[in-house]
Amino acid sequence: MSAIMFVGTASNSGKSFLAAVTCAYLRQRGVDVAPFKSQNMSLNSCVAKENGEIAVAQAFQAAMAGQEPSIHHNPVLLKPKGELRSEVIVHGKPIGTMSYREYREIVFEDPWQAVLESAEILSEEHEVIVAEGAGSPAEINVLDTDIANLRVAEALGADVILVADISRGGAFAAVYGTIELLPERWRRLIKGFLFNKFLGDESLLEPGIKELERRLGVRYLGTVRHVGDFWMPWEDSEALDTHSPGRGSVRIAVIRLPRISNFTDFEPLAMEPDVRVEFVDPRDNLPEDADAVILPGTRTTISDLEELRKRGMDEEVVQAADEGTVVLGVCGGYQMLGRELVDESGGELDPGESVPGLGLLDAVTVFPSDAGKVTVRSEGVVNHPHLRGIRVEGFEIHEGRTYTDEPHLVRLRSGYGNRGCFLDGAYRTDRPVLGTYLHGIFFNRRFRHEFLRWVSGGRWKPPERDVVREAVKRNLQVALEIVESTDLPELLGE
């Protein structure tokens, strides 16, 4: 086994991107490769083959590597829950909700041991590991408990590549400062540096590159130009800030809940031609001409529902449904659509307290104190009149159990559903309102197409091509071009 690790001078430098393209490159060269990010902080997660949670970014990298997503690709996942606390997930299962200080006290117990175990398993099963760090490896105030960067590289015996985003300015100083701040034993692990997201004349960089090589004794491995045609899942809320809704005639309004999660669910909609997906802040108004309104997942269903009430958006959602606009709730959004939410666990309210839902579905969701989180892959057949008979697959990540006499949306062949009954979701027969626990449902091409046709009143026409499959195919080609434009193949032994 050999290993390579990308670390960055800062967040959003391009580590995930370069890890993904390297996985895709090695896969196409016939190498058995696996991604690895020891610790990730993300609200976008999915369910791995072991029915445990991992970050969507590592699931995507696994797909680029030609592997089925595994809990060992991301052994520690931190999911922010507000008030400076995060849910800590180790090997796919939650071990508690903690502040950062509390987490630091136990980081070398279950979390670090899980990292070492996963690294060993991947090393035994694959020829190459492509690892990714988090943030910067030179955060000197937390180096003693950093299990996401060079401590991991040391354990893997990985060659480390430092990545800097040159589009933001300050990249030369960032490379120099990062390496200089590292302890000597970790500085020796850095085998080269890359500039990412470059636009312009590369020859202008040469004097600075030569000076960095002279001062640091570290090799320059190349510059990756800004790439606009490589599809990467939205990893964090910053992606929503830069997301352009486009000019499509079919308008989908996704409410940007304060603690929105799994907004990658809606990327396939945004990839379709003539479809406009916009994320609407609760402080704003829903567009009057929206063809569909979607309430997405959230880590704090009750708190986010109260925020909608505070802003008056709850009334706008109900009005939209009354006027015939399709309203869909996914996971936490589905729970909000019901008439009541009961917090038996005391996670957001005092134990046993409840709040009214939007009342668009005759459903009650209970957050029980004696039941754990559901994390499971699911598949089934849709029951809705406009979507009936469509086979779908996805995954469930939820703590609530929903009780309803409304018709079910999906009859599951595998999974959990509303309350372990193999019936998922619900819909109204007299209004276009529906809800589901299935994340990833829009990655099912036929469901996506029929949904768009329905909400648009038949004016949307599906393309002959599969936009998601086409994007993946394009990714593989772009990956070859990117890696071969640098000195990475030499470092990889290719």
UniProtKB/Swiss-Prot annotation:
Active site (record annotation): C331 (nucleophile), H439
Pathway membership: Cofactor biosynthesis; adenosylcobalamin biosynthesis
| PROSITE patterns assigned | GATASE_COBBQ
> Which Cys pairs are S-S linked?
none
Q: Which GO terms describe its biological process?
A: cobalamin biosynthetic process
Q: Where is the GATase cobBQ-type domain?
A: 249-447
For molecular function, the Gene Ontology terms on record are: ABC-type vitamin B12 transporter activity; catalytic activity
Instruction: Name the SUPFAM superfamilies for this protein.
Output: Class I glutamine amidotransferase-like (SSF52317), P-loop containing nucleoside triphosphate hydrolases (SSF52540)
Q: Pfam families, alphabetically?
A: CbiA (PF01656), GATase_3 (PF07685)
Record keyword Hydrolase present: no
Q: Which residues cross the membrane?
A: none
Instruction: Say what the protein does.
Output: Catalyzes amidations at positions B, D, E, and G on adenosylcobyrinic A,C-diamide. NH(2) groups are provided by glutamine, and one molecule of ATP is hydrogenolyzed for each amidation.
Give the matching NCBIfam families: cobQ, PRK00784.1
Q: Under what name is this protein listed? A: Probable cobyric acid synthase
Q: What is the species listed in this Swiss-Prot or TrEMBL entry?
A: Methanopyrus kandleri (strain AV19 / DSM 6324 / JCM 9639 / NBRC 100938)
Q: Tell me the name of the encoding gene.
A: cobQ
